[in-house]
Amino acid sequence: MASDFLPVRRALLSVSDKTGLIDLARALVARNVELLSTGGTAKAIREAGLPVKDVAELTGFPEMMDGRVKTLHPLVHGGLLGRAGIDEAVMAEHGIAPIDLLVLNLYPFESVTVKTDCTLADAVENIDIGGPAMLRSAAKNFARVAVATDPAQYADLLAELEANNGQLSAAKRFALSVAAFNRVAQYDAAISNYLSAVADSAETVPTRNPFPAQINSNFVKVMDLRYGENPHQSGAFYRDLYPVPGTLATFQQLQGKELSYNNLADADAAWECVRQFDAPACVIVKHANPCGVAVGAGCGDAYELAYATDPTSAFGGILAFNKTLDAATAKAILDRQFVEVLIAPDYDAGALEYATKKANVRVLKIPHGNGLNNYDTKRIGSGLLMQSADNRGMSLGELSVVTQRAPSEAELGDLLFAWRVAKYVKSNAIVYAKDSRTIGVGAGQMSRVVSAKIAALKAEEAKLTVAGSVMASDAFFPFRDGIDAAASAGIQAVIQPGGSMRDGEVIAAADEHGIAMVFTGVRHFRH
């Protein structure tokens, strides 16, 4: 059994990231801790006027091979691995003194290889060998040794030393050990991922296969969830080790109940949809489908228009905005409807103050960022489906007019708006829109024509006029019936990928009804 509290008398410091190094070293020296170090770390400590002993002096071997061999020595690893109450005699026989604390971070392999111009030689030179070996030795022997791998750990480590007269608890040593093994796993995964993706080792800057032979993923637990998708399922939320700026995983929860699995799934759909728009926009999501989307003069205007699409489905929904949410809009929302989650890049003080009146509402702030996920994944039985993320946009210049009548300028704007919304509606997806707002949404049907009929039904239920609206379809129409249904509802223009064997029949149907139609050449299935 590990002793609960053990003193720190001797520490080895070897870091690539010098953040906080001198303050840590100074605090350890003040506690009469003997410092051992290597290379640039020893130089920095010495230049700060602090006593430090080079590892080369300890081992009797100089650093060699351009620093590739520094710490791979029994006097180092024996000092880290020696077990209290078991190995003292062996250590004494071979002149091995115990090392109680290892402070080490690794060569910056990840930050070097993320650069597009990184050469294979640069990558290889930043593969740390001695560092991971020492981390594993120290972490394995947590019964006696403490190990710190991140400058963010220094303050807590020093606080515990201060509170316990220079000693660290077994709980602290174990927690640091787990963090060290996690760091080594992350580091090795990054090396494996990079080398597995190298298509040709003969290239100076090697081409990287986007789908390498092996993938090693690292996710960090953010929180436990009340349950999974259903109450009988357990759940938790993990984020990428290096989250992409502006994506959902970077959220801050400002108030409200704990988040659920479904809250986060819906929030992601809402946030990804709303961040497509430059003008103030509101997206209301229910069961991962947008049920109302609008662009307006401000957040309040956008909300009113989005809500009007489907007030029934908006109840208990997730609301996302792409601009700072003002107090008046927050009041209008919370006085009118039950909301599960509010999302915005920021909030006026008045909006946050009013939200406290509805303490259970989860309020998320996601700082602005233009980052996009590079990949989408989906678990299947004992496997993983992986694809490049659907980050494909669409501009007016990419549209092909295929009908006798071309869309008007106003219709073109609405077509692009509806196309952006359809991208986030479950297939088969049909979106009716007019004046940069949704009129009706048909989602998740096995038949495309049924989705079109549902969109019209939703508009009718909301007492919205379809006549003069446009329609977006996430995939091609296999038959003309979808166009016929749209025409009977009053649709004037259609945007769709095209590519059906019966495109000619579909185009002819549009011409019969005087409907303008454009092809995108891009499909947006969403399952």
Swiss-Prot record:
Family: Belongs to the PurH family.
Keywords: Hydrolase, Multifunctional enzyme, Purine biosynthesis, Transferase
UniProt name for this protein: Bifunctional purine biosynthesis protein PurH
EC numbers on record: 2.1.2.3, 3.5.4.10
Protein's GO biological process: 'de novo' IMP biosynthetic process
GO cellular component: cytosol
PANTHER family: BIFUNCTIONAL PURINE BIOSYNTHESIS PROTEIN ATIC, BIFUNCTIONAL PURINE BIOSYNTHESIS PROTEIN PURH
SUPFAM superfamilies tied to this protein: Cytidine deaminase-like, Methylglyoxal synthase-like
Record-annotated MGS-like domain positions: 1-149
HAMAP family: PurH
A GO molecular-function annotation: phosphoribosylaminoimidazolecarboxamide formyltransferase activity
Entry annotated with the keyword Hydrolase: yes
Domains: entry comment: The IMP cyclohydrolase activity resides in the N-terminal region.
Catalytic activity: (6R)-10-formyltetrahydrofolate + 5-amino-1-(5-phospho-beta-D-ribosyl)imidazole-4-carboxamide = 5-formamido-1-(5-phospho-D-ribosyl)imidazole-4-carboxamide + (6S)-5,6,7,8-tetrahydrofolate; IMP + H2O = 5-formamido-1-(5-phospho-D-ribosyl)imidazole-4-carboxamide
Pathway in which this enzyme or protein is active: Purine metabolism; IMP biosynthesis via de novo pathway; 5-formamido-1-(5-phospho-D-ribosyl)imidazole-4-carboxamide from 5-amino-1-(5-phospho-D-ribosyl)imidazole-4-carboxamide (10-formyl THF route): step 1/1; Purine metabolism; IMP biosynthesis via de novo pathway; IMP from 5-formamido-1-(5-phospho-D-ribosyl)imidazole-4-carboxamide: step 1/1
SMART domains according to UniProt: AICARFT_IMPCHas, MGS
